[in-house]
Amino acid sequence: MIAIIDYGVGNLFSLASSLKSLGLETKVTRDAAAIRAADHIILPGVGAFADAMAKLEATGLVPVIKQEVEHKPLLGICLGMQLLFEISYEYGEHTGLGLIPGEVCPLADDLKDPSLKVPHIGWNRLDIVPGRENDPLFKYTKPGEYVYYVHSFYAKNCAANTLAASEYSIPVTGAVKNGLVYGTQFHPEKSGDTGLRMLRAFAEL
């Protein structure tokens, strides 16, 4: 069973629907016992980092998540991926879950092409880091496939844990990994067949 953590941030319907379309047992929950019973965990999220982190802490699930990722796979999606990092500079300075080394910073501050818009919205090519092609998350993914992004902040100073990136005048971190903890800045559930294949690969970890 895949537990989708519901902590009041974002619409979880499309993610749950995508997983169910693959025939995967899914449960949207904020119950610690259900998360402990799950085989896999997904941490979704849209919106502001500080608000999301506060809501996640209010559920009491932070210690549960940190315990469970020691022996089962977790996938953070979009803001959920950003929460995995140590710190975010989104309208201030905020502490994250600290499951992946690195920081989350404003995309607009680093873009080399001022004509590019922020948020970064739409399809972009996912370039897998050389040597990472055989990661289990990419079991059904070919280098250069396109995925769907919607974000204004991005993870940086995390090269050792980066699996893939997309070009947006700078390399934008697209997927990360630390042990059993995975994250995608893009939305697999909005990335068509490519995203579905990646979700299937995650479910097989």
Describe the residue ranges of each PLM region.
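N-terminal beta1-alpha1 ligand-phosphate binding loop
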Residues: 2-24, 189-190
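Generic structural signal for residues in well-ordered beta-strands
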Residues: 26-28, 104
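Amide-donor transfer/coupling interface in amidating biosynthetic enzymes
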Residues: 103-205
